[in-house]
Amino acid sequence: MQPLLEFIDENVFGGMTGFVGPYGQRRVIYCDYTASGRPLKFIENYIRNYVYPFYANTHTTASATSRQTTKFRQDARDIIKKCVNAGEEDAVIFTGSGTTGAIHKLIHALQLRGKTIKRSVVFVGPFEHHSNILPWKETGVKIIRIQDNRHGTVNMEMLEAHLRKYRLADYNMYVAFSAASNVTGILTDTVAVSELCHKYGALSFWDYASAGPYLKIDMNPTPDGYKDAVFLSPHKFVGGPGTPGLLIAKKKLFRNPVPGGCGGGTVLFVTRETHLYLESIEEREEGGTPAIVESIRAGMVFQLKEAVGASVIEKREDDMCRKAFEIWRKNPDITILGNHNARRLPIFSMLIRHQDSGKMLHHNFVSVLLNDLYGIQARGGCACAGPYAQDLLGINETTAKRFTWFLEPHQQDDVEKSYKEPLEIMKPGFVRVNLPYFMDDETVHFVLEAIDMVATHGWKLLPQYQFDPHTGDWEHRDFNKDKVKRVFSLHDITYDEAGGNINTSVPKNYHATLEEIAQSASKTLENAVELNKEINTLQDQKVEFLDDKNQLIWFLQPNEAQFFLAAEILVHKPRAPLIRTKLPFKPETPSRMNRKRWPDIHQIQAYLRRMKEEKINNTEDVQVKANPNANGPPVKQNQAWTLPTEAKRRIISKRRAKMTRKSCAMQ
């Protein structure tokens, strides 16, 4: 690796921090940068030595401290503008705690209310985080979700069809897409999409929460490919914890003369009866005492990313993706979600299957096991991208509604007493890890091999764990009985006349090599049968229902794992049940993605022939459902693809020409 990448890796706080788990001491291996970055010693040292000594409020420059603090904050804004190629027409606004705050700020500026809502439409992409869906939904505006195509990227034909349709209807059109998925890391061609948007008079808004720390952000790459707004969460950058959200947007979008958070710092003059807001959008939209140190830190993390270079990061991450697929594609127990050939960041969401039962290992169990065995900090769940997660898991709307039953409180007399509260254990999900570009090769290999090992043998440790059906949390049966003593607390701090006291020991580093940790984990997995002998889980707590809801239990439970372990002892090999469990959903795999959801020319032509006979295909767009392959029979699908009118006309024209030639030949 480059020396600068090694410098970053060495400066991460907690890089060698140890903790005690059920299988001994482990070192923190952080693989959750997609959720949040980690602080850097270099940046925090600069803030402690240079920023804090001169810290003051920025709403004046009359004193040395306020003047210096104002200078630091303006430097941060200027650095960010340069890093994103912002022009004079662009504003950089620090706001909220992340992308969510930035989106709310933009929505307020657009004045989406009253009659404007009825004539506005927002197109969201296939990968969207809830932060880029829910704020738009709550305005009452029409929302249309653009699907992905067979390559796993944005379906540009579908987007263009809708843009054409709503331009003719004279709608205000907003396209709010993610530059990269926080689930699969798959990238979107932001320039191509922006150019298409502007061709039809739409505004292009971009969520860079996942992509921002790694990809080049260019507000003005081409004359027509400019971005109207970008939302950012700098806390996801390495060194970024404790930074505000960022909204970078064209100044013309701020149509609302009243700022999103009016108050101190937003006005030029206030009388007893009137007030005058500031002309500067950046000042007017940052009401109250701003997040001063946080903004300065944001400028520093952008400065660091620019020093590394987006091209260096991209090359490093491409290499990480290649290594990951080389190892994991050989393991039949691992299903990596999303298209494997699409350009992506090294963000991987996966399912772990227990082959003999046909069930999955619960994502929270896998995450806990990676922590306990290897120290790997992963994340389980749906990554706050529910619609995309359901696409990837193969969960249609009907099945999703069936799962919703488990997440609602029940008061009916016919519901078992223990199940009246929501059962989050039943919520489908996946395990997500990401590999930061500055992680050294040895650690990358350690993480890849650890996941491969857990995927193959992790189920054997299920009997040693128990779950809370209401929260979905998993914990080791014996180790966590005294878990309260194993975490730090602010209540450890006390004060007396002499000063403050911290009544606990400082976290210590753990210097065992990665090879030693891997060997310890392997030994634990090899001894799983012996470790489970004293545990009787056959009559243990389990999820079970009296009706057809049992068919929705998709994960292997501890008592079931004990049964399979007993089978291994008796016959010296895994023994599958007579009937393998049929999962209530089928996750998308590359082979399944190529067979469904996207129309082929044969079905389009057949559909248009029927429409022509019924004389209804001349004015409206046609909804064409997917065909599994060019020669196969149609399949039932919940999703539809809109065929543009021009494409229909071309097909009809070709067919007419072909029929004319046949007619001439017959004559």
Language-model-detected regions and their locations in the chain:
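Pyridoxal 5′-phosphate
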Residues: 1-615
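Extreme C-terminal disordered tails of eukaryotic proteins encode short linear targeting/docking signals used
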Residues: 581-667
